[in-house]
């Protein structure tokens, strides 16, 4: 549990006649101060000459700290374990006193392959973490394969700069589980239905293109000619009216998209989809060369009856931006998500292509700001990544599926920055040739 520094009583010796804080005289071992804030101590001598000294207390790595306790080990992705949650927000974020919570594992390869485990927590009541919109459920991404810790954060930033209706937010925090430091985690919002998340209202659907071996036993899905589509929300049963409604609508959209007059503005795919959402989803995943987004998984879309099908939210980029060694997605050159069946067909429509070029030009114009953000996040993690590596010792060794191995965090970040620049330069030229 964190020691309180909001009312800390310092001891000191001075060479002078008086010491004050904000004009108030101070006595050693007597006057409490709030050291979550920067303080200015002024020392004066008998002649009235004074000097001021800034006190800036930095706790641990400077990141907020989350303390989780569990009644038993977290060994399952399916079953919650009872526990507690406490957030020490330090000076940057609102702290949250200890409250009841439930904790379970999450993820697929990230859960089964790596020792640093990702978690999902469910608070006893809705709370805002790090200024994000309040909710009960929060994800703790371990970012074990991504030694920069920044790829998901970078993708989320691209999403926030796009026309996508909602993109998850996340913030870094040190995490202690049962008083054992488990390193830095990326605490994020979950892709789920909710007023403050994917707002599909009472009648909408949140869907995910997925794979049979990734489904849970109670998942309900349907298959188009091209994809297996998992109905994430709402809860439906096979054959009921809601199941039939969404299956028939998505199937009809795909039939029209792959049909003869697919680009007709009134009767083709434009009548069915929010085109800008498809374009921005495509561009973000293509810039990242996100290995799973071509056809495999974490491809989300949502639809409210009476409206158009929208792509998104974006999700799962720890193996993006070249961080994969088993596919051409390793390299910053070459198309990848462009070969997604739906996107590939839309790129046969000249109007779609022109809009893609316009949207990419807007994104590329923001590249200096994006790179500045990336450098700022890396600086924010300057102390934290060192503590994280002290625990997990991933620097300088291969972690699945890293295509390159560097000895230092700075080299890992530089590689990501260089890869991003090369990728965006390549896409700028390649789009002109479409």
Set out the residue ranges of the language-model regions:
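Beta-rich interaction/scaffold domains
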Residues: 1-63
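Short, well-structured beta-strand/strand-turn elements
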Residues: 17-21, 162-174
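Short strand-turn-strand beta-turns centered on an Asx-Gly dipeptide
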Residues: 22-23, 88, 178-179
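Short, solvent-exposed loop/turn and secondary-structure capping segments
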Residues: 132-134, 151-152, 185-187, 194-201, ...
């Amino acid at each position: 549990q964190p020691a309180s520094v909001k009312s800390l009583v310092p001891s000191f010796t001075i060479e002078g006649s008086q010491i004050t804080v904000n004009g108030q005289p101070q006595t050693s071992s007597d006057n409490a101060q709030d050291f979550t804030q920067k303080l200015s101590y002024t020392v004066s001598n008998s002649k009235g000459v004074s000097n001021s000294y800034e006190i800036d207390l930095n706790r641990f790595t400077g990141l907020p700290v989350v303390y989780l306790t569990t009644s038993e080990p977290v060994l399952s992705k399916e079953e919650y374990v009872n526990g507690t949650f406490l957030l020490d927000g330090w000076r940057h974020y609102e702290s949250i006193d200890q409250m009841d919570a439930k904790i379970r594992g999450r993820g697929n390869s990230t859960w089964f392959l790596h020792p640093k485990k990702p978690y999902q927590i469910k608070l006893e009541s809705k709370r805002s973490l790090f200024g994000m919109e309040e909710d009960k459920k929060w994800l703790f991404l371990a970012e074990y394969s991504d030694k920069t810790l920044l790829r998901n954060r970078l993708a989320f930033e691209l999403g926030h700069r796009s026309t996508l209706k909602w993109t998850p937010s996340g913030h870094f925090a040190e995490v202690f589980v049962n008083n054992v430091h488990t390193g830095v985690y990326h605490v994020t919002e979950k892709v789920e239905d909710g007023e403050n998340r994917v707002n599909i209202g009472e009648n909408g659907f949140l869907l995910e293109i997925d794979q049979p071996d990734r489904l849970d036993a109670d998942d309900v899905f349907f298959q188009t000619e091209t994809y297996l589509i998992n109905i994430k929300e709402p809860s439906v049963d096979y054959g009921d009216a809601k199941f039939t409604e969404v299956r028939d609508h998505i199937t009809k959209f795909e039939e029209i998209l792959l049909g003869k007059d697919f680009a007709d503005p009134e009767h083709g795919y434009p009548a069915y989809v929010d085109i800008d959402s498809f374009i921005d989803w495509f561009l973000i995943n293509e810039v990242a060369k996100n290995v799973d987004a071509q056809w495999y998984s974490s491809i989300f879309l949502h639809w409210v009856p009476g409206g158009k099908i929208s792509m998104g939210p974006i999700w799962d980029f720890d193996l993006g931006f070249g961080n994969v060694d088993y596919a051409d997605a390793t390299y910053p050159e070459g198309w990848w998500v462009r070969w997604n069946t739906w996107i590939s067909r839309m790129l046969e429509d000249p109007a779609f292509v022109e809009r893609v070029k316009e949207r990419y030009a807007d994104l590329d114009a923001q590249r200096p700001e994006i790179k500045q953000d990336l450098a700022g996040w890396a600086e924010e993690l300057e102390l934290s990544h060192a503590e994280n590596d002290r625990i997990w010792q991933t620097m300088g060794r291969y972690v699945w599926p890293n295509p390159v191995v560097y000895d230092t965090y700075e080299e890992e970040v530089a590689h990501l920055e260089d890869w991003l620049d090369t990728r965006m330069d390549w896409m700028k030229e390649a789009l002109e040739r479409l």
